[in-house]
Amino acid sequence: MDKENFTRLRGELFCDHPLARYTSWRVGGKAERFYRPADLFDLQDFLTQLPSDEPLTWLGLGSNVLIRDGGIKGTVILTLNRLKELSVVNSQLVFREKSGTEDFFSGNGKTIIRAEAGVTCAKLAKFCVSQGLEDGAFFAGIPGTVGGALAMNAGAFGGETWRTVIGVETMNHQGEILKRTPDEFKIHYRQVEGLENQFFIAGYFCFNHGDPDKAKTAINALLKKRNLSQPIGKYSCGSVFRNPPGDYAARLIESAGLKGKSIGNAEVSEKHANFILNKGNASAADIEALIHYVAQHVSQIHGIQLVKEVHIIGRS
């Protein structure tokens, strides 16, 4: 499919488009097609014109994904700063048509925020602070977008995305928007089941009212803690592995003597062992090889099989 096959589009469509600059590792091949929608309604128009069997890949901040050097078949959709609506909503109107009752999500002294998938978690955290919602400050520690946070139940500083979620909007391949509630999904540590070929396009988050100054203090303290313990400013994806029950992946990797271990131009961070860095011109193959090496070595030393938190996609 070429650009000539589409009409009414207000977004930007590219063919054979390099993807490395859209990922926090700065690696990866090309997308056969790459679309940046103008907004949610433009995205709907685009999807209705795609073949029903077109492979779709959704990309936000690109911070929890490793795209292989061979690139991605089908169409990649970039939500970052495109699905960007962020607002306080009337809690009594949220999902009323689904529940059949006006008080399905009554306020009860809380604030409900609707954030679209392309909003960064950092922006959501700052918005929470501006509203005096201290319990939303933990989103500042998640290096991704709302869509990605919903898809993997991302967390930081003891907080988890789905603990704050009261509802979501999803979109299917035909561009139809569905409103769904948390009980329709199986929520796990860094894993969410139940999308069934749909994609998160917005979340409704419920927070307690609080003092704006206390909320600002909380977010600053959390960011200071993160900056002291993580290699901020380096090319990485954040945490590579999930923490196993009762332990920490970083502790296991460090105690296995793997800090500073390199393959090609990929390196296990000296500052935080659960981060793998692109030292400048690493390939996706370098990083994937190092991920497998770390997992195998930790298994040999500790007898624990680390589970990847990062998603590896695309063609080798």
Swiss-Prot record:
Location within or outside the cell: Cytoplasm
GO process annotations (BP): cell division; cell wall organization; peptidoglycan biosynthetic process; regulation of cell shape
Source organism, top-level taxon: Bacteria
Pathway: Cell wall biogenesis; peptidoglycan biosynthesis
GO CC entries: cytosol
Molecular-function GO terms, alphabetical: FAD binding; flavin adenine dinucleotide binding; UDP-N-acetylmuramate dehydrogenase activity
Reaction(s) catalysed (UniProt annotation): UDP-N-acetyl-alpha-D-muramate + NADP(+) = UDP-N-acetyl-3-O-(1-carboxyvinyl)-alpha-D-glucosamine + NADPH + H(+)
FAD-binding PCMH-type domain: residues covered: 27-225
UniProt keyword terms in alphabetical order: Cell cycle, Cell division, Cell shape, Cell wall biogenesis/degradation, Cytoplasm, FAD, Flavoprotein, NADP, Oxidoreductase, Peptidoglycan synthesis
Pfam family, any one: MurB_C
The keyword Repeat belongs to this UniProt entry's keyword annotation: no
Keyword hit for Transcription regulation: no
Transmembrane intervals: none
InterPro entries, A to Z: FAD-bd_PCMH (IPR016166), FAD-bd_PCMH-like_sf (IPR036318), FAD-bd_PCMH_sub1 (IPR016167), FAD-bd_PCMH_sub2 (IPR016169), MurB (IPR003170), MurB_C (IPR011601), MurB_C_sf (IPR036635), Oxid_FAD_bind_N (IPR006094)
Sequence similarity: Belongs to the MurB family.
Stated role: Cell wall formation.
Protein name in UniProt: UDP-N-acetylenolpyruvoylglucosamine reductase
Protein source organism: Coxiella burnetii (strain RSA 493 / Nine Mile phase I)
The gene coding this protein: murB
